[in-house]
């Protein structure tokens, strides 16, 4: 059974441990993410979810364990190597260039994906090939009509959409999304759910998220983390009715919703 699970996985995490002082942020975490669809990781604050994503992206090195992506260990690979291998990450806090336009941000992401250094002093906006590719990604997230706007002048939700477009510009096999709904309003959340549903039909997504409505709408598989450990992984329906999950995180009302 484990061999079949591993064979079907684009991402296979084995016994991942990371401690900060005496605190175990990830404690013997093992997880298999199947190719295609959306796998969400949920849990209370301090459960280790963001630390897990940081280890997967290469931002933080684990103390022990292994990470296999697309059949190869990436444990010793840096962030840039993992990105080139097909892992793209968005952050819990927006990480866009606020004084540049939406299109310029997307073009810089395309440029980075093509292996070129960011040409901050060059007239990037005059490169039509870059612009065309960038506009395709902006269209995917519904920002093509806002491409000329300065990022600081648009809503937080639109900045989150831009982050997704920039991640897509990396031509990833898998997206690592750290709370894509964080800080955005109800209407923008609905829009992001629509976007991620479309993206998830084409790409594998591993997503950390606190918005349970969004998680239940999007996820094909759910993993629940508590105190640095994965206590359950299953379908949404089975997670919602899991007594241990209800006791540790969701609360008894979720099974009745």
Which positions does each model-derived feature cover?
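Glycine-rich phosphate-binding loops of nucleotide-dependent enzymes
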Residues: 2-257
């Amino acid at each position: 059974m484990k061999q079949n699970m591993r064979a079907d996985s684009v991402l296979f995490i084995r016994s991942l441990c990371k401690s900060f002082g005496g605190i175990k942020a990830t404690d013997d975490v093992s997880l298999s993410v199947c190719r295609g669809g959306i796998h969400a990781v949920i849990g209370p604050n301090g459960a280790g979810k963001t630390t897990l994503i940081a280890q997967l992206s290469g931002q933080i090195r684990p103390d022990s364990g292994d990470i296999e992506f697309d059949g190869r260990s990436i444990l010793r690979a840096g962030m840039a190597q993992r990105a080139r291998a097909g892992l793209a990450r968005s952050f819990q806090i927006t990480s866009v260039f606020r004084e540049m336009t939406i299109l310029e941000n997307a073009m810089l992401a395309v440029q980075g994906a093509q292996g070129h250094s960011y040409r901050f002093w060059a007239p990037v906006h005059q490169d039509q090939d870059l612009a065309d590719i960038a506009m395709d990604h902006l269209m995917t997230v519904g920002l093509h009509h806002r491409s000329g706007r300065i990022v600081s002048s648009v809503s937080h939700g639109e900045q989150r959409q831009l982050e997704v477009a920039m991640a897509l510009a990396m031509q990833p096999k898998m997206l690592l999304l750290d709370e894509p709904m964080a800080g955005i309003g109800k209407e923008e959340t609905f829009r992001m759910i629509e976007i991620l549903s479309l993206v998830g039909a084409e790409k594998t997504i591993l997503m950390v998220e606190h918005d349970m409505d969004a998680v239940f709408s999007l996820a094909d598989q759910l993993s629940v983390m508590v105190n640095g450990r994965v206590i359950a992984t299953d379908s949404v329906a089975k997670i919602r009715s899991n007594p241990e999950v209800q006791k540790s995180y969701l609360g008894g009302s979720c099974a009745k919703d």
